[in-house]
UniProtKB/Swiss-Prot annotation:
Example GO molecular function: RNA binding
Keywords: Coiled coil, Cytoplasm, Cytoskeleton, Plant defense, RNA-binding
Transmembrane segments: none
Record's compositionally biased regions (Polar residues): 1-15, 34-46
Protein name (Swiss-Prot/TrEMBL): Protein MICROTUBULE BINDING PROTEIN 2C
Amino acid sequence: MYEQQQHFMDLQSDSGFGDDSSWLAGDDDLRLSPHQSAAGTNSGNENLDRRLLKDLVEMVPLIEHYMEHKERSSFKRRGSMIYTKMPSKESLSRRGRNASQTVPGRKKRDQEGNDDVMNNSREDDENAKALAGAEKEEMSRLREQVNDLQTKLSEKEEVLKSMEMSKNQVNEIQEKLEATNRLVAEKDMLIKSMQLQLSDTKIKLADKQAALEKTQWEAKTTGTRAIKLQEQLDAVEGDISTFTRVFETLAKTDSKKPDRDYDAVPYEFDHLPYLDDVDETDLRKMEEARLAYVAAVNTAKEREDEESLVMAAQARAYLQSLAFTY
């Protein structure tokens, strides 16, 4: 391939490729000099050479473009195209004069060169067709790869969008979960506070219940005590009535004599010998003890307490001690 490109460059150098005034640049009005027209004896061969050169010149940019942009495994080395400047008209005139002097040798060389150019052109056509086919295949393969990549990219974008939506949903769920946890924590604190208040209320209720039971017990005890006091009071009143009768009997020193005599036999009372020995001092003490006992009993009735009852009991015992002496 590199040799073919070098051959193309040689042809371009010989035919004046690269100048704006060259016939290869598309100037159809440019005519050869008289010396050059005299040197070209075979016009058909010249037309053939021009067509081949034109085709080759049109193929060179395609090959160069392909070699610059499409690296193939079979063409790992790249050759660079070197464009030479077209000779001036004066140099072309000099070359025409020199060519007119050597026409027979030039014809022979031109004939051989034309054969080589035709062979090379056929090879170049085949190579160009092969390169064009390979380029088409490469372009098709690249298009397929690009389409596949675009499809994969679209799928990736869809996956990313789906992941983004899922992430947003997860974030929303996480926020809702955190809000729910906060509400649950607040409810737990409220429940604990209510439980503490309920415990305090239960304790207070138990205290009140105990106080009520104590009050009921005290009331019951007080009622029982009142009954006992009433019984004791009744007994004391009975004793007082007994002692009163005794004192009234003792207070009578002599009996009342009748105004006149009766024939009936008087009733004989039993004699109480222990009353004869009682003097006035003992009777006065017993009377004072009786009055003190009566006062103690009255006080106990008014107050209804243990102290009054104790005093009444002491007064009764003192009175009994005086009475039972005789």
